[in-house]
Regions:
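Active-site helical microenvironments for divalent-metal-assisted chemistry
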Residues: 1-151
Length: 151
């Protein structure tokens, strides 16, 4: 499984190479932060791969062909929002898989914290924060803010 994590990091680094994320940081930093919140190598592998399929540069089939565990591929597939898919239908699909849910919760937490740290929140930031909170509550039944405030 450790070898899979190494492969996943290499793939994610190649796909995110040269791209910038929020606050103009290298895009790879987000999946690395999400990965760092995971407790085992399977969930770390999913975390580092969670955005790669949406990039359009690799498919679930290619991840399977590389030899990633079917459970990893299933979770990554659920975490890859399909074109035209409504956001909360996407969240409902994630709920069907514990591994995908675990990674999505870490993803939402990281996204929430990055947007909250902006000194001047834009209207878009506020809308995204509201969406993250609603998705988190949908997945857990708990408030994202109250959960983070206790960490």
């Amino acid at each position: 499984m450790k070898n899979s994590l190494n492969k996943a990091i290499i793939i994610a680094a190649k796909i995110h190479k040269g791209k910038k994320g929020r606050n103009r940081e290298p895009a790879i930093m987000h999946p690395i932060r999400v990965m760092s919140l995971m407790k085992n190598n399977r969930s770390r592998t999913v975390a580092v791969l969670h955005d790669v399929v949406e990039s359009g540069k690799i498919t679930i089939q290619e991840l399977e062909d590389i030899g990633f565990d079917p459970k990893v591929c299933k979770a990554v597939d659920l975490l890859s929002r399909k074109k035209g898919q409504k956001y909360f239908n996407y969240i409902d699909n994630i709920k069907t898989n514990k591994l995908a849910t675990t990674v999505k919760l870490a993803d939402l937490t990281d996204n929430y914290l990055r947007r909250k740290q902006n000194r001047t929140s834009s209207k878009v930031d506020k809308q995204k924060i509201k969406k993250y909170k609603k998705a988190y509550k949908s997945l857990t039944g708990y408030s994202l803010k109250s959960t983070i405030d206790h960490v």
